[in-house]
């Protein structure tokens, strides 16, 4: 059984991994290369090598009730979508509540993680770190890699002939912090993911003109969904997930297309994906269509060539006098402290069992946490990964044979390509609810709906038709939390609480309003029949 566990990184995945280690009675030590927790969500004015970077205005794309850890709801007065500083505040509250800071060695860089000579029998690792210029060695029974995958910028300059002639400024979106200094400029943003769209919208408020280039187009969703509820609280239900799994693919694609076009017609805005039958991750942005309507942003096709001052696009159009090019072209990822044979990265892909475990190790004592991109919140996903991993380390859960794991990796990759395509940005993509259930099943934390229908039908209905959030995985099994049921039944109140900033009359007036509507309808019917009688 693993006892001493090295956790690399004190971002979201690192913090929840620490807690899961403590919950299972393991002895974690976390190595964080910077001076504080939070990882990518801790904004800093300057870009730092080896550290994820965000712009000052970043707001979460997943809502608080769908993003909180399973036994620690966010404060009810927190907004539904959080500015990065507010999310960091939650992580600080979380770390303090569970006393996690004492396990973290700050300003400590992991230089290497190597198998011990007797690894085949012990499963142990030699971890070399550096702090204040001094190297230290330590042996650990297991390692959790939580270093993230938004550190190494991907800038495919060879795909942009003429970039060497371009006289303006160009840089990766990782270096963008705020709109200051870009006033009155003509700006080209290459790439229309979440970051590219956010940056284009923000710059368009004061720039002379913003262009955004997209190779394949994209669906754009608002954070606001039916009846004003957060999109993910509506989209991610077990019922809807079941429909997407059992209906024919063509029907599912048609439904998704109709849903995406309900807000605005993507074809009219030049955004409709070329292959709209691939379930590409949509962009979450509330302002893109508005800025397009205002002409502040213009959608362009793929850049064919760049000159000293202009951009030539594949459709033959040319935009002159470009001052700035921002490459919002995503990230590559690597693990420089690991031997290539441990977690091999090829074409921005890794072969890991359930996106977590290398399949070829004699002992399953190395795991990657958070190296995934679900169509939902990463926080509950990383938590379930860590809960399973720590139980594997402890010997309470076991993995199948190497052959079985490799077959799963191959089939999972084929399914991913079939659903999401082969783009580099989609290599870590997976279905949200299905993946959470898969992990929960491994540790015995998936709720039994048939049983609940008889024992607690009210809760069963909420689980199936309501938001599929992390509390569901604390109802049963190891780590069961007595507050889980109440958290599920009261989540609507926490969603609405931060919106109740203006005193209104009691909501019971709704019933009076409804009654008046019924009476009005009856009056219309009576008037109609009276008219027939007199005619």
From Swiss-Prot:
Necessary cofactors: FAD; Mg(2+)
Keyword Repeat appears in the UniProt entry: no
Gene3D superfamilies, A to Z: FAD/NAD(P)-binding domain (3.50.50.60)
Keyword Acetylation (UniProt): yes
GO molecular-function term, one example from the UniProt record: flavin adenine dinucleotide binding
InterPro entries: FAD/NAD-bd_sf, Flavin_mOase, Flavin_mOase-like, Flavin_mOase_2, FMO-like
A single GO cellular-component term on record: endoplasmic reticulum membrane
Cross-linked residues, Glycyl lysine isopeptide (Lys-Gly) (interchain with G-Cter in SUMO): 492
Positions annotated to bind FAD: 9-13, 32, 40-41, 61-62
Alphabetical keyword list: Acetylation, Endoplasmic reticulum, FAD, Flavoprotein, Isopeptide bond, Magnesium, Membrane, Microsome, Monooxygenase, NADP, Oxidoreductase, Transmembrane, Transmembrane helix, Ubl conjugation
Binding site for NADP(+): 60-61, 195-198
EC supergroup of this enzyme: oxidoreductase
Residue positions, PTM N-acetylalanine: 2
Main location: membrane
EC code: 1.14.13.-
Pfam family, one: FMO-like
Subcellular location, record wording: Microsome membrane; Endoplasmic reticulum membrane
Topology of the protein relative to the lipid bilayer: Single-pass membrane protein
Listed transmembrane segments: 510-530
Similarity field: Belongs to the FMO family.
Function comment: Catalyzes the oxidative metabolism of numerous xenobiotics, including mainly therapeutic drugs and insecticides that contain a soft nucleophile, most commonly nitrogen and sulfur and participates to their bioactivation.
The name this protein goes by in its record: Dimethylaniline monooxygenase [N-oxide-forming] 2
Organism: Gorilla gorilla gorilla
